[in-house]
Every structure is written in structure tokens, then in C-alpha cells.
From Swiss-Prot:
GO terms for biological process: adaptive immune response. It is found in: Cell membrane. V region of the variable domain of T cell receptor (TR) alpha chain that participates in the antigen recognition. Alpha-beta T cell receptors are antigen specific receptors which are essential to the immune response and are present on the cell surface of T lymphocytes. Recognize peptide-major histocompatibility (MH) (pMH) complexes that are displayed by antigen presenting cells (APC), a prerequisite for efficient T cell adaptive immunity against pathogens. The keyword Cell membrane applies. GO terms for cellular component: T cell receptor complex. This is T cell receptor alpha variable 8-1. It comes from Homo sapiens.
């Protein structure tokens, strides 16, 4: 059985105005068996219009954009089978993947702008 260790960190982008915001991620380290489903929680505190992002950093590589939400359909499809759902009433943008692979081992970052 292969296990995935997925460290999860939060990131905040600065706004152009003075309103405060923050991001919190529920899962700081996740260990999963290969083919298990993954859900990483991300909540933000900001009442205005937001742009939401998930980034991934694979071992030894640079940070790369996994998916983003600006407006429209709240279910966002990303690369490599990842998706995230924007739920405005809960201030959440949770990342999901129905079946993780060993190659998904990485650090995942939720961000709001």
C-alpha cells in the first residue's frame, strides 16, 4: 500500500484596498492510500468579491497554478483531475480529487485575492 503525505499551507494575496482578509486550511498534513479520495478544506474571511486559487508545489519543482475561480460556475475543474467548489455562503473553496495517485504527493496552497 502506498501512502501520500500532503502538507497543506495557506496563502494570502494583498488587496488593492484596505479591507482585511485571511485564509485558513483545515488539513495541515494528510496521509492517504493511493486511489483514496481527497478533500482539502479552504475557508476565507472576506465579504467582498473574491478571486480564489489553488496552487500546487511538487517536490523539487516551482509553485504552479492548479485551478482558479473568478465568477460563474461554482464547480471549477483543474488539471490532473482536481476540482474545487466555491460556496459563497460558507466562505469556502474546497479542493477535491476522487482518486489520488502517488504522483499527487505535494504541498497544496489555497489563496484569495
Amino acid at each position: 500500500m502506498l501512502l501520500l503525505l500532503i502538507p497543506v499551507l495557506g496563502m494570502i494575496f494583498a488587496l488593492r484596498d484596505a479591507r482585511a482578509q485571511s485564509v485558513s486550511q483545515h488539513n495541515h498534513h494528510v496521509i492517504l492510500s493511493e486511489a483514496a479520495s481527497l478533500e482539502l478544506g479552504c475557508n476565507y474571511s472576506y465579504g467582498g468579491t473574491v478571486n480564489l486559487f489553488w496552487y500546487v508545489q511538487y517536490p523539487g519543482q516551482h509553485l504552479q497554478l492548479l485551478l482558479k475561480y473568478f465568477s460563474g460556475d461554482p464547480l471549477v475543474k483543474g488539471i490532473k483531475g482536481f476540482e474545487a467548489e466555491f460556496i459563497k455562503s460558507k466562505f469556502s473553496f474546497n479542493l477535491r480529487k476522487p482518486s489520488v495517485q502517488w504522483s499527487d504527493t505535494a504541498e497544496y496552497f489555497c489563496a484569495v485575492n
